[in-house]
């Protein structure tokens, strides 16, 4: 049983129709009706050893803990308003917490997002020693009623787009885990993509009324594209040669490039669909948001995700996104 089957089996009971919950489960955010607005609500959990390495810079961790939630709001096209923080710590470390909170507040201030409450506790010890540091953030955003993006609106004929570049975060993690060896200069270029991802909030807002479906790429391009395909009841064809890569990843062997870009995760870019007649508007919206976007495929009738090479042929090796319950115990990738 993978994590999505777990959710579907145990935690997917249809909500009671009260008129308040407009969308619950299956998307990056829940949507709550509030007059002419909707509140977008998301929550993400970060566990030491699973989502981040113990030696991570605490300021970077504070940034990322909030960034992964703001990325979900961006995928919904919502403007961040506030967040709640719950944390479990094995011990009090004032200097560590000073740095963590500084990183957290710096990103919050950049998006006018207020810490509105939370909870703290001590992490229970485990057989190997101290329990892991654990952080859970719930973020709340706002979007005009009826303008939120979901995963279910893609239609045959739409084009598939992605923001920024993919795979740098996975490459940095592979180096930190000893799987590849990067030069210090190369690591300095890709490590911020792993530890300080930039949520594409401005782009998400700019795509209101343009994107037909949207998701943030947290678990890998192939896996997250599959969520759009399943939710929309369509097939996504991805031209892997068109997937944008950074210069460091682009210089790596092909198999490593594909693994990082298609299945690595931790990118926190926006993957979205839009009709071809909106191409100029999409590019203008991206330019206004200060983010590059690339067309990487198309939507067809059918189901699933088809990964194609430069000649338009299916890749021999297919790639899946990150799955918490399929990964080995040493995996430290994200998967929010």
Short names for language-model regions:
Residues 2-15, 57, 90-116, 121-135, ...:
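Glycine-/charge-enriched secondary-structure boundary and capping motifs
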Residues 65-76, 108:
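A short, N-terminal amphipathic alpha-helix
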Residues 78-89, 93:
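Short beta-strand-loop/turn "lid" adjacent to the catalytic site in phosphate-handling enzymes
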Residues 19-21, 29-30, 105, 119-129, ...:
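A generic local secondary-structure boundary/capping motif
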Residues 21-23, 54-68, 92-102:
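Glycine-rich anion/phosphate-binding loops
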């Amino acid at each position: 049983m993978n994590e999505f089957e777990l959710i579907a089996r145990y935690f997917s009971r249809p909500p009671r129709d009260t008129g308040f919950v407009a969308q619950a489960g299956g998307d990056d955010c829940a949507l709550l009706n509030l007059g002419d607005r909707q509140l977008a609500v998301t929550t993400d959990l970060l566990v030491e050893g699973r989502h981040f390495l113990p030696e991570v810079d605490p300021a970077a961790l504070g940034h990322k803990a909030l960034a992964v939630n703001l990325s979900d709001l961006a995928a919904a096209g919502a403007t961040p308003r506030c967040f709640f923080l719950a944390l479990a710590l094995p011990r009090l470390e004032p200097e560590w917490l000073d740095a963590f909170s500084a990183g957290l507040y710096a990103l919050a201030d950049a998006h006018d997002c207020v810490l509105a409450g939370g909870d703290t506790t001590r992490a229970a010890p485990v057989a190997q020693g101290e329990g892991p540091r654990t952080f859970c953030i719930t973020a709340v955003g706002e979007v005009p009623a009826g303008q939120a993006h979901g995963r279910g609106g893609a239609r045959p004929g739409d084009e598939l787009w992605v923001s920024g570049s993919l795979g740098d975060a996975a490459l940095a993690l592979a180096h930190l885990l000893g799987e590849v060896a990067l030069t210090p200069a190369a690591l300095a270029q890709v490590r911020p993509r792993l530890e300080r991802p930039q949520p594409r909030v401005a782009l998400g807002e700019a795509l209101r009324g343009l994107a037909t479906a949207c998701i943030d790429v947290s678990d890998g391009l192939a896996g997250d594209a599959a969520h759009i395909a399943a939710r929309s009841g369509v097939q996504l064809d991805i031209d892997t040669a068109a997937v944008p890569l950074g210069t460091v990843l682009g210089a790596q062997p092909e198999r490593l490039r594909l693994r990082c870009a298609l299945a690595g995760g931790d990118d926190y870019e926006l993957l979205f669909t839009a009709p071809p007649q909106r191409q100029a508007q999409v590019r203008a919206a991206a330019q206004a948001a200060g983010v590059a976007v690339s067309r990487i495929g198309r939507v067809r009738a059918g189901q699933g995700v088809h990964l194609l090479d430069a000649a338009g042929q299916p890749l021999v090796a297919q790639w899946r996104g990150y799955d918490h319950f399929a990964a080995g115990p040493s995996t430290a990738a994200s998967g929010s």
